[in-house]
Amino acid sequence: MKKIPDAVRLFQVTDSHCYASDDSRLTWTDMPIYPNLSLKAMLAHLRTRVVGYSALMLTGDLAQEETPATYQRVNTMLNAFPLPVYTIPGNHDIPKMMQENLSGNVQMPEHVAVGKWHLLLLDTHADGKPDGRLTDEQFERFEKLLVSIREDHFVAVFMHHHPVPIGSEWMDVMGLRQRTYFWNLVEHFPQVKVVFNGHIHQEFNGQHEYAGGRTVAVHGTPATCVQMKPVRQNIEFDHTRPAWRDIALLPDGSVQTQVHYLPFVVREEAIKSSI
């Protein structure tokens, strides 16, 4: 993706599904996935590309094994990364445990302003539920933030769950539950230009279109562990190459973005170093 002067450049990484031990293998697929090693490989690769970037956006499902030790291990890996890391919970996470064990370079803000762009991070986690939900209080805070943003500024929203259907029946029942309410609210704020989500373990590039012709782009990002095949009635695993999304938020309010995959499959022997 071509570098553009004055663009706000971000990495998005999502769905690492980590464990307390780097030796742990992902249990819900037969594919040989060691989530901690995949995340380590991703961070090592991105570390060589950080010039000109503002932050790493980590959009949920940090943990598969939801324990303090897992979040402490993830925190250690992320604090070795030379950019601020902004993160939100996914359905596999425990938000309170994240807050208690993530620190230093790793933050859980609701609002980050970078130039004319505002990054709004929504926590769509709901205890014991695979789908995404926002409470009335969260919607109220979201609306207040939008009201506070100047009309000549721009908004990029980050959430774990997808706010539009992606065409896979088994996954679409686990998207954002209140998507209609969400889009009705966003309709009043033309500053909102784009939504980025995780959760779906596949690349998705779509949009929500309003009756008047306005569109808001929606981009889903593949995981750092295992990928799933798109447009399926039932879950089908695809491959194990970790992915990230490169994001450029331009000064005129437009967005450029592209998904990349590591050029190799992460195997247990691929990374021997202990970060």
Where would I find each of the regions flagged by the language model?
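N-terminal active-site segment of His-dependent metallophosphoesterases
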Residues: 1-73
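Extended active-site neighborhood of metal-dependent phosphoesterases/phosphodiesterases
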Residues: 2, 67-154, 178-191, 209-222, ...
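Active-site neighborhood of phospho(di)ester-bond hydrolases with catalytic His/Asp-centered motifs
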Residues: 12-14, 55-61, 85-91, 123, ...
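Active-site environment of divalent metal-dependent phosphoester hydrolases
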Residues: 17-22, 64-69, 92-97, 127-130, ...
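His/acidic metal-ligating clusters that form di-metal
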Residues: 42-55, 132-217, 255-256, 273
